[in-house]
C-alpha cells in the first residue's frame, strides 16, 4: 500500500537501510518540484524574477531563454513562425531530457505530479478500489489530438486546458477555472482510475515518453539476483509494467521503456538494493 509521506512498501527498506536512504529519491523529487514552482513564483510574489514566464516558455535570470519542445512543436503545427531564441531554448530542454530521461519532467518538475501522488495516497489510505482500466495508448492519441487541434485552430489549443499552466496561474492569481481543471485531475485519479492522468491520459507525458526512449540515464536492476519477490518496487512504481523485462528477463538489466519516469521509487523501496541509477554505457 503506497503512502505519500511514509510509504509502507518502503518499511522493510527503511528498517534495513534507514529512513533517509529509503526516501532519498522521493525527497529529491519533492524538493525539485517545489523549487521549480518557487522559481516561477518568486517574481509575482517577491519581486525577484528567477524564472519569468511559465513551464511552457520562460527566461532564467533575464538571460537564458527556455522553451518546452512540445509547445514549440504545437506552435509549428499552428503555423506560427518559430523564433531563433525559442528554437535554441527548446533544443536545450530537449537535449537535457534526452540525457536524463524524458519523463524526468513528470517526476521531478511537473507540479501536477504532487496532486496526482496525493490522490493516489488517499486512494490507498481510504481503501478506494475502483480502478477503471484505461488504455495507456490513449495519451498518445491525445498527443496527436493536441497537434491536430493546433493545426486546425491556429493556436496552441492545449494551453487552454493544460493542468500545469492552470495550476501555476491558480497559485499566482487565486481561484478560477484553472483550479477547476486541477481539481478534475485530482478527482479522476482519486475516484475513477489508479494514476489515470499521468499514466494514461497526459499528452505531455506521452511526448516526453517518446523522448525518453533514447535517453542515456536509466534505472538498472543490476543486482536482480538479490530480488526476493517482495513486490515493493511494483507497488511503488507508477508504471509497474516497465520493471518486468529488466528484473525478470534474461537480457539487459536496464529499464529501457520510455514510460519509465526515472523517479527512483524502486530504488528507494527495495530492501535488497536491487535497483540503481545507471546509464546505457554502464548498465
UniProtKB/Swiss-Prot annotation:
Residue sites binding [4Fe-4S] cluster 2 per the record: 237, 260, 263, 266
Q: Name one GO cellular component term.
A: plasma membrane
Describe which pathway this protein belongs to, using the record's wording: One-carbon metabolism; methylamine degradation
- Stored InterPro entries: 4Fe4S_Fe-S-bd, 4Fe4S_Fe_S_CS, Electron_Trans/Redox, NapH_MauN
Record Gene3D superfamilies = 3.30.70.20
**Keyword Protein transport applies:** no
Query: What role is this protein assigned?
Result: Involved in electron transfer.
The protein in question is named: Methylamine utilization ferredoxin-type protein MauN
Amino acid at each position: 500500500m503506497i503512502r505519500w509521506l511514509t510509504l509502507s512498501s518502503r518499511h522493510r527498506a527503511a528498517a534495513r537501510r534507514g529512513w533517509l536512504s529509503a526516501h532519498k529519491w522521493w525527497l529529491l523529487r519533492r524538493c525539485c518540484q517545489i523549487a521549480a514552482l518557487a522559481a516561477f513564483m518568486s517574481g509575482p510574489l517577491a519581486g525577484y524574477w528567477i524564472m519569468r514566464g511559465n513551464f511552457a516558455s520562460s527566461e532564467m535570470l533575464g538571460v537564458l531563454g527556455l522553451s518546452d519542445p512540445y509547445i514549440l512543436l504545437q506552435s509549428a503545427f499552428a503555423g506560427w513562425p518559430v523564433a531563433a531564441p525559442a528554437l535554441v531554448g527548446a533544443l536545450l530542454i530537449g537535449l537535457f531530457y534526452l540525457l536524463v530521461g524524458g519523463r524526468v519532467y513528470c517526476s521531478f518538475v511537473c507540479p501536477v505530479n504532487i496532486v496526482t501522488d496525493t490522490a493516489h495516497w488517499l486512494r490507498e489510505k481510504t481503501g478506494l478500489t475502483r480502478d477503471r482500466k484505461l488504455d495507456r495508448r490513449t495519451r498518445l492519441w491525445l498527443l496527436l489530438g493536441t497537434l491536430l487541434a493546433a493545426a486546425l485552430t491556429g493556436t496552441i489549443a492545449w494551453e487552454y486546458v493544460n493542468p500545469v499552466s492552470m495550476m501555476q496561474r491558480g497559485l499566482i492569481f487565486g481561484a478560477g477555472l484553472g483550479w477547476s481543471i486541477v481539481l478534475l485531475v485530482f478527482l479522476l485519479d482519486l475516484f475513477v482510475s489508479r494514476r489515470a492522468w499521468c499514466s494514461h491520459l497526459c499528452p505531455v507525458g506521452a511526448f516526453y515518453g517518446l523522448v525518453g526512449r533514447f535517453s542515456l540515464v536509466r534505472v538498472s536492476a543490476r543486482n536482480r539476483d538479490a530480488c526476493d519477490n517482495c513486490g515493493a518496487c511494483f507497488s511503488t512504481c507508477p508504471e509497474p509494467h516497465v520493471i518486468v523485462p529488466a528484473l525478470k528477463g534474461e537480457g539487459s538489466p536496464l529499464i529501457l521503456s520510455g514510460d519509465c519516469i526515472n523517479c527512483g521509487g524502486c530504488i528507494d523501496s527495495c530492501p535488497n538494493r536491487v535497483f540503481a541509477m545507471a546509464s546505457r554505457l554502464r548498465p
